[in-house]
Amino acid sequence: MSRIALYPGSFDPVTNGHLDVVRHAVELCDRLVVAIGIHPGKKPLFTTEERLVMVRRVFEPVAEAAGCAFDCTTYDNLTVTAAQQVGASLMIRGLRDGTDLDYEMQIAGMNETMAPGVHTVFLPASVGVRPITATLVRQIAAMGGDVSAFVPPDVAASLKSKFAG
């Protein structure tokens, strides 16, 4: 039986922090499914299709290099339901700090009650990516700042293009 892991997020945009999580996650599973959450109340910078392309372009080579099957999907329901729908027994969550841990522990507890077969795996962020958030990256890019230290090169180019003119 293969071990399937779901890594959910908005990925708006993909950051080096997300990439750090994926590099570790592919070592824990046979198949990694990155799930992009679609939230009706949120207005993302990148369209769903743009985020799907970004996620595939950045994460798929990492999974392939590790011998891990890779998939990308979207979901607009409960994250734990999305995990069940793809057959995941693991849900991957990255942690930057104690605030993340407190929040994620609450969510993990609720998810465990709703889906006892889906186990949350917390991956601590590597030191170099701990301060990175997609929100800060968007703000820096919107103000014309250089985000190349925080996102993969393709993503930096996409952000520059998004805010040009």
UniProtKB/Swiss-Prot annotation:
Instruction: Provide the binding site for substrate.
Output: S10, K42, T79, R93
The leader peptide range reads none
Instruction: Supply the gene name.
Output: coaD
Q: Where is the organism placed in the taxonomic lineage, from the top?
A: Bacteria, Pseudomonadati, Pseudomonadota, Alphaproteobacteria, Hyphomicrobiales
Needed co-factor(s): Mg(2+)
Give the record's subunit note: Homohexamer.
Q: Where in the cell is it found?
A: Cytoplasm
UniProt main location, coarse: cytoplasm
* Keywords, alphabetical: ATP-binding, Coenzyme A biosynthesis, Cytoplasm, Magnesium, Nucleotide-binding, Nucleotidyltransferase, Transferase
Name the residues annotated as site: Transition state stabilizer.
Answer: H18
Q: List the disulfide bonds.
A: none
Q: Give a yes or no for keyword Lyase in this entry.
A: no
Choose any GO biological process term that the UniProt entry carries and state it.
coenzyme A biosynthetic process
One Pfam family per UniProt: CTP_transf_like
| GO CC annotation terms, alphabetical | cytoplasm
Function, as annotated: Reversibly transfers an adenylyl group from ATP to 4'-phosphopantetheine, yielding dephospho-CoA (dPCoA) and pyrophosphate.
Q: Where does ATP bind?
A: S10, F11, H18, G94, L95, R96, E104, V129, R130, P131, I132, T133, A134, T135
Q: Cite the annotated pathway.
A: Cofactor biosynthesis; coenzyme A biosynthesis; CoA from (R)-pantothenate: step 4/5
State the PANTHER family in the record: PHOSPHOPANTETHEINE ADENYLYLTRANSFERASE (PTHR21342:SF1)
Which family does the UniProt entry place this protein in? Belongs to the bacterial CoaD family.
What is the name listed in the Swiss-Prot or TrEMBL entry for this protein?
Phosphopantetheine adenylyltransferase
Query: Recorded GO terms, molecular function?
Result: ATP binding; pantetheine-phosphate adenylyltransferase activity
Domain of life of the organism encoding this protein: Bacteria
Keyword Nucleotidyltransferase assigned to the entry: answer is yes
Q: What is its EC number?
A: 2.7.7.3
Question: Per the record, what are the reactions this protein catalyses?
Answer: (R)-4'-phosphopantetheine + ATP + H(+) = 3'-dephospho-CoA + diphosphate
